[in-house]
């Protein structure tokens, strides 16, 4: 097999189809041809002398040799001039292209044509007799099998005839190896395998033989039939295509191939084939033309290609007007009506069905200012089908020609709606389209009262008609009937809900918008998810307008869970239904990793989620989904469901469309921080604020939030974080103060004092830093083992007095000074400042409640402790009853 081409080996081994084999072979031949051309160019460049014209002596010697050697005889001993005469008499060309090229070269070299002699004529008569016998037989293609291998080919056929199949196969393989372009060995191999019963292998070799001898159309057709026996429609189409290459006008081949294309579902190719058949049919084949055009128009119409269907039917009507039947008129009118070309449909009906429309003008008022009114009359001959009459009515309605409709309507309503319900509906829909609701209502009422046409689509039209006429209650009943018959009809549900809301029935309005699909269906069916999303949008709007916030949040979470399904799995968040609040509602909870579906289920869920995501984003844009998410977060916080707001933010941050948008990601992080603080989840809040202050070191608002979070977290991990950040940003004022606070809380008073002094130097007029320095000195003086305690106390109170002067006399400043004295045991001085603070009102700060800044309870409690320790319990109780009782 080493001499075989790789594509042939792959085809024989069944690795590729025959179409692939032919494609690879053509590509290989093209590559080989290009490589030969490139080699020829290279050799011409390397040996430029070879491309020059040879000397005349060489030419003359060649000519003399050609004349001497039998005067240009062919291999069978006959001069080429005889062949020329023979060919000119028969009007045929040589089959062998190589011999034709040689003849052309001979003719170019010979200066004068050779005239036939008497001997040539004698030989010509012999050749004519021989060729006449050949022409009596079937014309066979010229073989590409070399003479040296013809004997071996004959031997292989003899071996096959004797039953020695293996030897015959080996001989054929050897011939293929030496002459891969000869079709005879492949044909013999096909017969051998067919004799063995291996029809698949036989077909393979037959296809190769046909490929090497492609002009035999009957062989291609036979191979197509064999392919169909093996249910290989694609290969059969390929064979018919090959046959049509050599017989492009064969109608049978075109018909068979188009039928196969229809079986394959390739509507376009099938219709192209049928169109070619139409072009090939003669004018005498009118019936066949009309039938084929009729079938093509129906097929185009079913494929929603109305324009092509109209073109086909127009061509049929123009070429064979005398063969147009009532069925053709009905089809043409249907096509034009579906394309809203009512004038064309009316023209077809009046031209080919015998129906006559006449305009009669009254004689009154002949002036141009007072144009005479026109009365249109309609005459319908007997035998016109009711279908065409109804299409005439539809056209008249849309063209606003209403005069002849009354007798036509009378004729229609005389028909039984059980039998002619579809015609009733066509006319009713035409009236609805032009706004003639009063005319449409009787027809629709007759249909909904029938048994056969008591359908959802009819009830829907009936409801729309009643709604347009203002009969809201009856319209609501009809919409309810639609929902009963078709529970998944979204538009009917929405219309029913809107009507019931207008009629003052909010509970029924909500009931109409109950979910249509279960969660499993929504997770797998993209169209179901799309319908459910539209319904939930209307339901959420209705719930919000009714003030039902828990139900409103349920719909928002349901919609967001459809979008964030994969993201929620990554965030380990699950949406559950629970009745913990007394009513059943949806809640977001955190679940463990082992409760999340395994990887295989996750992959399939991801694939489904991609398809569903494409549908969901077609209903709502990215910004609409973002607004929906914000509404859900705000609503959860309004209901004090802060933990669920956190989980929703976590899931949204796992959603790539939101996370990739930097602005939205930052906004989500702020939402997460706020929800965590409101939920008192300060550990999680610290994770948010830590990143924020790293990115915005010089933002005081973030440092204020950071201080609040760390103050409530009861955690000291932020100490090292602040120190590391201080090394990177040594000039940051907020970090300086925070590090002072951290050191003060940790008992490192000297470190705290250094940080406070640094802050004091940059902002000496800030009362806080004077207060912090004074308080630090007092704490240092309060330690058990300390040197120069008196100096520390003096320095501490000097800074506290500075704080008092900067802050001014107020409840806060006197209270803080009293606390310092109280800590040092200077009770009499502490009582003085406590009493002064107790006499002053609390500070008024915009945005903060007055009670939040009132220190009288704290002052009274400290005073009560002093009085109690001194034995004055009555005074202590009086203070507690006055300021600390609830």
Swiss-Prot record:
- Cell location: Nucleus
This chain's source organism reads: Homo sapiens (Human)
Per UniProt, subunit arrangement is: Part of the TFIIIC subcomplex TFIIIC2, consisting of six subunits, GTF3C1, GTF3C2, GTF3C3, GTF3C4, GTF3C5 and GTF3C6. Interacts with BRF1 and TBP.
Any idea which residues bear N-acetylserine here? 2
Q: Where is the composition biased (Polar residues)?
A: 53-63
Show the ranges annotated as biased composition (Basic and acidic residues). 12-44
**Function statement:** Involved in RNA polymerase III-mediated transcription. Integral, tightly associated component of the DNA-binding TFIIIC2 subcomplex that directly binds tRNA and virus-associated RNA promoters.
Under the heading InterPro entries, the entry gives: Tfc4/TFIIIC-102/Sfc4 (IPR039340), TPR-like_helical_dom_sf (IPR011990), TPR_rpt (IPR019734)
Q: Name one GO molecular function term.
A: DNA binding
Residue numbers carrying Phosphoserine = 43, 282
| TPR repeat coordinates | 149-182, 183-216, 217-250, 252-284, 290-323, 326-361, 421-454, 456-489, 491-523, 733-766, 811-844
Q: Which Gene3D superfamilies match?
A: Tetratricopeptide repeat domain (1.25.40.10)
Gene Ontology BP, a term: 5S class rRNA transcription by RNA polymerase III
Disulfide bridges in this chain: none
One Gene Ontology cellular component: nuclear membrane
Record-given protein name: General transcription factor 3C polypeptide 3
């Amino acid at each position: 097999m080493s001499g075989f081409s790789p594509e042939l080996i792959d085809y024989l081994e069944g690795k590729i189809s025959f179409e692939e084999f032919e494609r690879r072979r053509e590509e290989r031949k093209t590559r080989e041809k290009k490589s030969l051309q490139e080699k020829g160019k290279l050799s011409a460049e390397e040996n430029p002398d070879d491309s020059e014209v040879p000397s005349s002596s060489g030419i003359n010697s060649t000519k003399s040799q050609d004349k001497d050697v039998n005067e240009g005889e062919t291999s069978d001993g006959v001069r080429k001039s005889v062949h020329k005469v023979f060919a000119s008499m028969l009007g045929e060309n040589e089959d062998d292209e190589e011999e034709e090229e040689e003849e052309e070269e001979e003719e170019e070299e010979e200066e004068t044509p050779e005239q036939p002699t008497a001997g040539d004529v004698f030989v010509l008569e012999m050749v004519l007799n021989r060729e006449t016998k050949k022409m009596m037989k079937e014309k066979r293609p010229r073989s590409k099998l070399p003479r040296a291998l013809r004997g071996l080919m004959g031997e292989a056929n003899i071996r096959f005839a004797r039953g020695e199949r293996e030897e015959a196969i080996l001989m054929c393989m050897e011939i293929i190896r030496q002459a891969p372009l000869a079709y005879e060995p492949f044909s013999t191999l096909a017969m051998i395998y067919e004799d063995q019963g291996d029809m698949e292998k036989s077909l393979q070799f037959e296809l190769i033989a046909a490929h090497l001898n492609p002009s035999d159309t009957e062989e291609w057709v036979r191979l197509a039939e064999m392919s169909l026996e093996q249910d290989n429609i694609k290969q059969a189409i390929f064979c018919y295509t090959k046959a049509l290459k050599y017989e492009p006008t064969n109608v049978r081949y075109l018909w068979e191939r188009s039928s196969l294309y229809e079986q394959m579902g390739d509507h376009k190719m099938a219709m192209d084939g049928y169109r070619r058949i139409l072009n090939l049919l003669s004018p005498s084949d009118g019936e066949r033309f009309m039938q084929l055009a009729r079938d093509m128009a129906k097929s185009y119409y079913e494929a929603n290609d109305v324009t092509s269907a109209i073109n086909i039917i127009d061509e049929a009507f123009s070429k064979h007007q005398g063969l147009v039947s009532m069925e053709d008129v009905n089809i043409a009118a249907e096509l034009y009506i579906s394309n809203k070309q009512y004038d064309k449909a009316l023209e077809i009906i009046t031209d080919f069905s015998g129906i006559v429309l006449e305009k009669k003008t009254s004689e009154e008022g002949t002036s141009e200012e007072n144009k005479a009114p026109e009365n249109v009359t309609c005459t319908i001959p007997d035998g016109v089908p009711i279908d065409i009459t109804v299409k005439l009515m539809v056209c008249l309605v849309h063209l606003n020609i209403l005069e002849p409709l009354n007798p036509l309507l009378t004729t229609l309503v005389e028909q039984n709606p059980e039998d002619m319900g579809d015609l009733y509906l066509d006319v009713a829909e035409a009236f609805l389209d032009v706004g003639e609701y009063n005319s449409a209502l009787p027809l629709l009422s007759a249909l909904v009262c029938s048994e056969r046409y008591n359908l959802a689509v009819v009830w829907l039209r009936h409801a729309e008609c009643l709604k347009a006429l203002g009969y809201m209650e009856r319209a609501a009943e009809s919409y309810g009937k639609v929902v009963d018959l078709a529970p998944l009809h979204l538009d009917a549900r929405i219309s029913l809900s809107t009507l019931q809301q207008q009629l003052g029935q909010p509970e029924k309005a909500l009931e109409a918008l109950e979910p249509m699909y279960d969660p499993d269906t929504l997770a797998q069916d993209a169209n179901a998810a799309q319908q459910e999303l539209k319904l939930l949008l209307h339901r959420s709007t209705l719930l919000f307008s009714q003030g039902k916030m828990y139900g409103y949040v349920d719909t928002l979470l349901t919609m967001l869970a459809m979008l964030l399904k994969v993201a929620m799995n990554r965030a380990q968040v699950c949406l559950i239904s629970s009745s913990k609040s007394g009513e059943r509602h949806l809640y977001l909870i955190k679940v463990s990793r082992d409760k999340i579906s395994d990887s295989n289920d996750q992959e399939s869920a991801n694939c489904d989620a991609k398809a569903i995501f494409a549908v969901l984003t077609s209903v709502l844009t990215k910004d609409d989904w973002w607004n929906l998410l914000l509404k859900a977060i705000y609503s959860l916080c309004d209901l004090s469901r802060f933990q669920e707001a956190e989980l929703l933010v976590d899931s949204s941050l796992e959603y790539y469309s939101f996370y990739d948008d930097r602005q939205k990601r930052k906004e989500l992080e702020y939402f997460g921080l706020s929800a965590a603080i409101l939920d008192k989840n300060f550990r999680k809040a610290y994770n948010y604020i830590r990143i924020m202050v790293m990115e915005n070191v010089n933002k005081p608002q973030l440092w204020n939030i950071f201080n609040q979070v760390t103050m409530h977290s009861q955690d000291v991990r932020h100490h090292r974080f602040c120190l590391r950040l201080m090394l990177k940003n040594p000039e940051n004022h907020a970090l300086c103060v925070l590090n002072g606070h951290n050191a003060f809380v940790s008992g490192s008073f000297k470190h705290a004092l250094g940080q406070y002094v640094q802050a004091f130097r940059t902002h000496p007029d800030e009362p806080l830093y004077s207060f912090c320095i004074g308080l630090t000195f007092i704490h240092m003086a309060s330690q058990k083992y300390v040197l120069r305690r008196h100096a520390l106390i003096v320095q501490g109170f000097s800074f506290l007095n500075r704080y008092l002067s900067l802050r001014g006399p107020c409840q806060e400043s006197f209270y803080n000074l009293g606390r310092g004295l109280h800590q040092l045991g200077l009770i009499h001085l502490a009582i003085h400042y406590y009493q002064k603070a107790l006499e002053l009102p609390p500070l008024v700060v915009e945005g903060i409640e007055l009670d939040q800044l009132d220190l009288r309870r704290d002052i009274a409690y400290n005073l009560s402790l002093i009085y109690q320790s001194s034995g004055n319990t009555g005074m202590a109780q009086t203070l507690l009853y006055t300021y600390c009782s609830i």
